[in-house]
Regions:
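Phosphoinositide-binding peripheral membrane targeting modules
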Residues: 119-185
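Non-catalytic C-terminal accessory region of glycerolipid acyltransferases
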Residues: 1-90, 172-173, 177-207
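A broad, low-specificity signal marking well-ordered, structured residues that form hydrophobic/aromatic
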Residues: 24, 46, 108, 134, ...
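Anionic N-terminal interaction surfaces
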Residues: 65-133
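Weak global preference for isoleucine
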Residues: 5, 57, 86, 92-94, ...
Length: 207
């Protein structure tokens, strides 16, 4: 859970620069991708664009909530505690007007911004397979382009999930390796949600 701290970077962008990669939901209201960096970045603060709760982070990766005057309230807690709070939040289905061939009883949880989808046909080459949006449902990881759906992977068949530096999500399906770079979006959000839905499916429950 430790964030890499590069002195040359945090002087320009503050200690909170990578915080939203891990805290992809507001710890207070649960809004997805709700936390935004507060300017100037030297304040080392993030604020929720939905409920306006704010936090400050220090060099030891501890956070404290911030009052309306921008002062910490003294309730410092380690970053892993906040991450655990997010993992304990229930998954909330969302809606879309885009047609992705959802089946009866299938629920949608995540939609990405436009992304590239890479596929490894032969080791070690990863090549661009498509450009479109990723959709995560209670049953499948779907990638939709303007021309169709090149990938509709059942969650039970997705394995080897990992997140690499640069917010790249890797996974395998039917013996092939795939990669989706999630620039300016938390890849960990996708990793955690896929894992939670897989675990819920094995238990016969919702996420």
């Amino acid at each position: 859970y430790e964030l890499p701290i590069d002195p040359s970077k945090y002087r320009r962008r503050g200690l909170a620069v990578n915080l939203t990669r891990l805290l992809y939901r507001c710890p207070s209201c649960g809004t997805q991708e709700g936390l935004k960096l507060v300017r100037p970045y030297s304040t080392n603060r993030v604020e929720c664009s939905s409920c306006f709760s704010a936090w400050v982070i220090d060099a030891t990766c501890r956070l404290a909530s911030v009052d309306e005057n921008g002062q910490d309230e003294g309730n410092w807690a380690p970053l892993p505690d906040y991450y655990s709070r997010i993992l304990a939040m229930p998954l909330i289905p969302i809606r879309t007007e885009l047609r992705i061939g959802m089946e009866q009883g299938e629920e949608l949880y995540l939609i990405s911004r436009p992304r590239f989808l890479f596929k490894q046909e032969q080791f070690p080459n990863l090549r661009v397979l498509a450009f479109g949006r990723a959709f995560l449902t209670s049953r499948r990881l779907i990638f939709r382009t303007r021309l169709g759906i090149p990938l509709a992977a059942p969650l039970a068949g997705i394995g080897a999930l990992s997140v690499d530096p640069g917010d790249k999500l890797h996974f395998t399906h039917e013996g092939k390796l795939y990669r989706i770079p999630f620039r300016n979006e938390s890849a960990l959000k996708w990793f955690d949600t896929i894992r939670r839905l897989q675990q819920a499916a094995r238990r016969g429950q919702k996420g």
